[in-house]
């Protein structure tokens, strides 16, 4: 294999994930086989690969940028936060337990390092002529964590990777970020840094020339690029950044409110709607006013019962019920659909609130006649279906859930199955409760025809003309965005120092 490359950052949110994706696409253009890899990631924005293994969405995106199918070996350790300083631990795509922050490295460091090396071996055997493109996590110089590092310098030294250090100038203090990071590196670690990259620069590049010269003189490391500010092309890995995303669209014709749940997961499900020029997404947090949007989406949740509690305590749940009863459109995805049901029971405490007695199940929003029980085994699979609502359409996506939802006995006359597989989701026929529907299929909005059919239901209610439904799926738009990202990266970044040329 070619010498591995690694993208490190001075902090979380510096832009490592997108710069890694850009690097993968650029190497692919140059005839290489880049292989994305992040030893350990912490995220509730997940993807399910063809084998039924969970991995972080950011590594799936990097795989697409590299022209490869995502596989969980590209992210062998995934930590999915579930509140109270506890995370679900995923090794090579499968759940292996939960861990508390204070004991994680004591209990899970050795098993984690073992599966990371196993995944690396598998990838190296599968792509003998490839080049690993590694992504670090957070900052590589968190002094209190370095002894148990699984993702940054331990991996860089193990593979003798050539490293790129990315700093976000938008946050301010970029010189302190870089100089502070380099000063905390040991000499043997600093030798691995082959280039510096300034990310999210606004304005004319020549205004940074003096700063670039100073950094190179002080560090002895070339500044190989200054990436301009790009309106965020893809969802941030951290859900805390969601409210800082795009502003108001000038051409938006419909507004869709999306509930920003405390344990929000799989928010990349909404990315195809973000890409619709006539759609404005408005993220609504518990405790804020819902208003009368044209539709409401309840996305997935890592802690469904806990998030349902939050909706009820804040009054947002009752606002949503009133909205639906007034004829509004409500759509739930996975945990969001479960919340729309009558009851939710979690006897094992998997979703935030333990309900050991079925009779003590938590009440849902009661907008769909569903009862849900959360079970130990998790449904993990990619799937294809033919929808029956809003109309016939081929759709594909993936399932990722503990909950098993069943229609209440005698309620079949009040709902329609969404697809040829009735368990994929349901839509209410009760017009007094609005157009309420839900699905277990993550990625449903990636399907272009289905997305437009759903949007046209909303547009019809507003008296707007239908949008064309004969369109491509979002994966083609994603390809265009990846190419745009790589175009800008190629224009502004010289990767030769990384390649040793």
Curated annotation (Swiss-Prot):
- InterPro entries (UniProt xref): Class_I_gatase-like, CobQ/CobB/MinD/ParA_Nub-bd_dom, CobQ_GATase1, CobQ_synth, GATase_3, P-loop_NTPase
For molecular function, the Gene Ontology terms on record are:
ABC-type vitamin B12 transporter activity; catalytic activity
Q: Which domain of life is it from?
A: Bacteria
Gene Ontology BP, a term: cobalamin biosynthetic process
Gene3D superfamilies linked: 3.40.50.880, P-loop containing nucleotide triphosphate hydrolases (3.40.50.300)
Active-site feature positions: 334 (nucleophile), 442
Q: In which pathway does it act?
A: Cofactor biosynthesis; adenosylcobalamin biosynthesis
| Record's keyword terms, sorted | Cobalamin biosynthesis, Glutamine amidotransferase
The GATase cobBQ-type domain, residue ranges: 253-450
Q: Which family does it belong to?
A: Belongs to the CobB/CobQ family. CobQ subfamily.
**Annotated HAMAP family:** CobQ (MF_00028)
Main function: Catalyzes amidations at positions B, D, E, and G on adenosylcobyrinic A,C-diamide. NH(2) groups are provided by glutamine, and one molecule of ATP is hydrogenolyzed for each amidation.
> How is this protein named in the record?
Cobyric acid synthase
In the UniProt record, what gene is named as encoding this protein?
Answer: cobQ
């Amino acid at each position: 294999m070619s010498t591995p490359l690694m993208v490190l950052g001075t902090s979380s949110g510096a832009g490592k994930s997108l710069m890694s994706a850009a690097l993968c696409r650029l190497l692919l253009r140059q005839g290489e086989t880049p292989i994305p890899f992040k030893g350990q990631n912490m995220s509730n924005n997940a993807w399910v690969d063809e084998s039924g293994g969970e991995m972080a969405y950011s590594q799936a995106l990097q795989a697409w940028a590299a022209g490869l199918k995502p596989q969980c070996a590209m992210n062998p350790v995934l930590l999915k936060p579930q509140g109270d300083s506890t995370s679900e631990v995923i090794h090579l795509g499968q759940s292996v337990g939960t861990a508390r922050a204070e004991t994680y490295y004591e209990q899970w460091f050795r098993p984690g390092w073992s599966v990371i090396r196993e995944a690396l071996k598998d990838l190296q055997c599968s792509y003998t002529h490839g080049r690993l493109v590694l992504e670090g996590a957070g900052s590589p110089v968190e002094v209190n964590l370095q002894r148990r590092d699984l993702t940054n310098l331990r991996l860089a030294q193990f593979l003798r990777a050539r490293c790129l250090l990315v700093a976000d100038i938008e946050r301010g203090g970029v010189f302190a970020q870089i100089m502070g990071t380099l000063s905390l590196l040991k000499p043997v670690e600093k030798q691995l840094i082959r280039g510096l990259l300034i990310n999210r620069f606004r304005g004319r590049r020549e205004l940074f020339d003096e700063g670039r010269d100073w950094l190179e003189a002080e560090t002895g490391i070339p500044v190989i690029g200054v990436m301009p500010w790009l309106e965020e092309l893809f969802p941030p890995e951290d859900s805390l950044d969601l409210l800082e995303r795009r502003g108001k669209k000038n051409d938006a014709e419909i507004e869709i409110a999306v509930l920003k749940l405390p344990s929000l997961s799989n928010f990349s499900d909404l990315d195809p709607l973000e890409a619709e020029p006539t759609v404005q997404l408005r993220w609504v947090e518990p405790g804020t006013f819902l208003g009368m949007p044209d539709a409401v989406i309840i996305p997935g949740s890592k802690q469904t019962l806990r998030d349902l509690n939050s909706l009820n305590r804040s009054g947002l749940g009752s606002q949503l019920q009133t909205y639906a009863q007034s004829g509004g459109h409500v759509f739930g995805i996975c945990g969001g659909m479960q919340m729309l049901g009558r009851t939710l029971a979690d006897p094992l405490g998997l979703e935030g609130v333990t309900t050991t007695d079925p009779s003590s199940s938590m009440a849902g929003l009661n907008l769909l006649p569903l009862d849900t029980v959360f079970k130990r085994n998790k449904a993990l699979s990619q799937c294809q279906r033919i929808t029956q609502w809003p109309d016939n359409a081929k759709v594909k996506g993936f399932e990722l859930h503990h909950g098993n939802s069943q229609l209440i006995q005698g309620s079949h006359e009040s709902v329609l199955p969404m697809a040829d597989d009735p368990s994929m989701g349901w839509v209410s026929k009760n017009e007094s409760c609005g157009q309420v529907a839900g699905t277990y299929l993550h990625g449903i909005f990636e399907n272009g025809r289905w997305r437009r059919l759903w949007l046209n239901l909303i547009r019809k209610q507003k008296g707007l003309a239908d949008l064309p439904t004969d369109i491509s799926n979002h994966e083609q738009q994603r390809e265009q965005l990846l190419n745009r990202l790589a175009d800008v990266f190629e224009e502004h970044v010289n990767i030769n120092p990384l390649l040793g040329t």
